[in-house]
């Protein structure tokens, strides 16, 4: 299973990629008002070298209670990718290290007992049309 997870606290952002059971992560401190450069984060975990976004099975982000803006930015970025690729996106409520986040995302997704319950974990929806 291939999982991509992102967390941000506003002044520290991390990205983690799980390919089967191997985890590759990158974390960086930045000014609170700076928007993360997502291309740079993806490049640092091997995007277009060891994986492509279309190969990801599950996207996850941390719902960080310390920075609602950081959570909205992260969720919006991953939601756009997940919708475009028709892949699941889940939110993790715990305050975890980035490596732990990707592990918990996998466990949460796989622990769903049936397809209906898995669908309830997916936090993406199609945009409404007028």
Give residue spans per PLM region.
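Phosphate/pyrophosphate-binding loops at sites that engage ATP/ADP/AMP, CoA/4′-phosphopantetheine
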Residues: 42-57
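Oxyanion-binding and handling regions
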Residues: 1-36, 40, 51, 89-125, ...
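Generic beta-strand or strand-like secondary-structure segments
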Residues: 41, 76-80, 94
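DPxDG-like acidic metal-binding loop motif
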Residues: 58-63, 68-89
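A generic structural micro-environment signature
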Residues: 12, 32, 74-79, 83, ...
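Short, low-complexity, polar/charged sequence segments that are solvent-exposed and flexible
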Residues: 22-25, 44-47, 78-81
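Short, flexible active-site loop motifs that bind/organize anionic cofactors or intermediates
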Residues: 28, 46, 64
């Amino acid at each position: 299973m291939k999982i991509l997870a992102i967390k941000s606290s506003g002044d520290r952002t991390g990205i983690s990629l799980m390919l089967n059971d191997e985890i590759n992560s990158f974390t960086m401190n930045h000014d609170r008002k700076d928007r993360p450069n997502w291309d740079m984060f993806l490049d640092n975990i091997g995007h277009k070298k060891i994986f492509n976004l279309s190969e990801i099975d599950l996207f996850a982000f941390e719902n960080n209670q310390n920075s609602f803006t950081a959570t909205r930015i992260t969720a919006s970025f991953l939601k756009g990718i997940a919708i475009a690729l028709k892949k699941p996106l889940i939110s993790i409520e715990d305050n975890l290290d980035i490596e732990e986040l990707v592990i918990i995302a996998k466990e949460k997704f796989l622990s769903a007992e049936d397809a209906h319950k898995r669908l309830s974990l997916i936090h993406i929806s199609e945009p409404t049309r007028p």
